[in-house]
Amino acid sequence: MKIKKSIADLAAPLHTILTMVLAVLAISSFRADKTKTIFMIGDSTMANKDISGDKQERGWGMMLQNYFDDGIIVDNHAVNGRSSKSFINEGRWKAVLDRIMPGDYLIIQFGHNDEKTDSARHTTPGTTFDANLRRFVREAREKGATPILMNSVVRRNFSDSKTAVADDDLRDNSSKQLAEGDTLIDTHGEYLVSPRRVAKEMGVVFVDANKITHDLEQSMGKEGSKKLHMIFKPGETPSLPDGRQDNTHYNIFGANKVAGLLDDALCRQVAELAKHHVYYDIYVSKNGSGQFDDLESAVASAPKGRKVTIAVSGGEWKKPEAMKGKKVKFVLTRGAKFL
């Protein structure tokens, strides 16, 4: 007996087979792409900065990518002047949350602007500040991500300043007439406690960024610690002809130094991230995330007679020719290549 099959009868199994093939391809693609993303939310001490016109300010989050191999992507969403409250109310948190995928990480660091008195930003430790931190943690976990809480980096405050908090927005030291002592003085108070408390309560990794940066600045002293910050004399750098006295925000050297220390602390607690940890002597990038934006300057800074590894990030580069006496090894990252 001859059985006739309609086009519809044939289409059904073909559709099923096609669906299965596409599913297998999708799974294979997912497994092949083993990169994970570290999302970052926070304020100006972490944020990416405008580097045009030789501007020197950097957030430590700009430099974090230097300390991971190509298996980790750092996606920094920190924004100048934001508190945990304004970051949520402006829709910035939703935009980040929509991008988070299972297996990703989220670094949360607020406090500098939660201290501000204006209603758009102010939160209170123990109540509204803690509630916002819990929300970040809970919603990140719901997306399959691993949240990481940090408290605020320290302000360089060696005097009995009453204006240190307000000076963040001014990018100035309104108390520069006060004599500086030898001991760093805290300006954050209970805003340092909330991230630790929420981390313990919710079983989240906590990095004490305040202690780490406090110890760094204290060890460098009241004069040496100026090298970390946006403290320039008039005419010292073209982008600041009148100079600047900013004890909160980092310059290139400071941001890179802090990023390295916080990455070390992070990798000590998160084994999966530690697998991707890398360290090089010098970092070069055209997007402001390096210590230098050109190879010639990077090579010139390398000491003679000592092996130095220079990481070159992204883009096309001309390999320097004049390297007499320099034992330099280049490592190309993020798709960088020599012409």
Predicted regions and their residues:
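Bacterial Sec-dependent signal peptides at the C-terminal "C-region" and cleavage site
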Residues: 15, 25-35
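Serine-esterase "nucleophile elbow" of acetyl-processing enzymes
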Residues: 31-78, 94-106
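Alpha-helical cap/lid subdomain in secreted, periplasmic
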Residues: 1, 33, 91-252, 256, ...
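N-terminal extracellular ligand-recognition/capping segment immediately after the signal peptide
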Residues: 289-292, 306-339
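Short aromatic-glycine-(Arg/Gly/Cys) micro-motifs in beta-strand/loop hairpins
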Residues: 279-285
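Bacterial N-terminal signal peptides that target proteins for export
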Residues: 3-18
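Active-site metal-binding loops of divalent metal-dependent hydrolases
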Residues: 44, 112, 315
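Short, solvent-exposed loop/turn elements at domain surfaces
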Residues: 46-51, 84-86, 291-292
